[in-house]
Amino acid sequence: MKLPVILLASELLCSGSMHAQSAKPEKKAKAYMVADAHLDTQWNWDVQTTIKEYVWNTLSRNLFLLKKYPDYIFNFEGGVKYAWMKEYFPSEYEQLKAFVRSGRWHISGSSWEASDVLVPSVESSIRNILLGQEYYRKEFGTESTDIFLPDCFGFGWTLPTIAKHCGLIGFSSQKLDWRNHPFYGESKHPFMLGLWKGIDGSSIMLAHGYDYGKRWNNIDLSEDKELLGLTKRTPLNTVYRYYGTGDTGGSPSIGSVSSVEKGIKGNGPLEIISATSDQLFKDYLPYEKHSELPVFNGELLMDVHGTGCYTSQAAMKLYNRQNELLGDAAERAAVAADWLGIAGYPGESLTEAWKRFIFHQFHDDLTGTSIPRAYEFSWNDELLSLKQFSGVLTASVGAVSEKMDTRVKGIPVVFYNALGFPVTDVAEVAIEAPKFPKGVSVYN
């Protein structure tokens, strides 16, 4: 009576073996394909060229690809560029918004501009993110979750801390490939995928994206040996791979997008994922559960042109720092005037001034690597913001001063300390007098 049962089990086992042989092999290696069209706001051209040509090319070409290829996902950074799209190309901008809602056009980078992250103050860097996120919430009903800087000249140890405290989870770039000297051995990176720890111990995930101008010509990427080799460089058996174009915007080539689409449907050993710039980071949350992730605790600096960038165009560095200091001082005075009920808070004016000069913290602008023509626009905007901040500061301090009891013998002088702590320093005051006095007494 047992024989039929044994035979039946044998038949089932054979059937299962045959089914396993005919099934697709399990794909253990993953490739996150991140499409981008990096656009330098100013470099070998000025901002007018960017708006008239490169922003339009980026918008129109990617709308075409999104309509033609159902698996295509495009990533683009910089709130100021989206604002230009809205202002100059409103019809196409509405189409873009529809693709954002469907998850096909991804808002990357979180910030108002893809800025340098070494020269700006921490206040500027955080405000850059806040201004970007505010724009994205208002326009698209969403926020970004990553720092997306494919082309930037070094990354300070503060960046993971800033990102973490702004609610961001990951950071990607490809610029460290440009280094002359390795971090250790022959590697120019601490790792391809892992955790980057900031100065306060905060961690975000770090991904090296490789060359953002990478192209393929209508191949099945699930069989691509180069990509498969890159997955073996991480303990995750995974690669995070930029593809597209750089500097002048535009879009990935049709052959590249077609290759990704074929790879998604392919039978090779690689799982091809048409990815947003933050998908990999989200897939590995919470990071505490991934002990296999290597950890880097330090700064990621460039040793090539990055060094010269921090001495070039000194006027830009000066104007930028003056705006950072004056903007902060103006806001403190405006808050005091508003709190005392003396004057309304000029939020719109202050935000406008911050946006105007933060846009010039772009990594080819503030760093001093753009053509002379570009700096005609940069200096103009820096000076406009200085004037605007100065107006707010003067009006706010003046309003507060008018409410103070200054009935004293002699000439009353009001000092405003914009810092958050007491200061002992030398102050200069110009006073009117009928003739040069023999002496001056100062009373507190």
Segments predicted by a language model, with ranges:
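Sec/Tat signal peptide C-region and signal peptidase I cleavage site
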Residues: 16-20
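Catalytic-domain carbohydrate-binding cleft regions of carbohydrate-active enzymes
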Residues: 21-420, 425, 437-439
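Solvent-exposed beta-hairpin/edge-strand motifs
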Residues: 432-444
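Positively charged n-region of N-terminal signal peptides that target proteins for export
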Residues: 1-4
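Bacterial N-terminal signal peptides
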Residues: 6-15
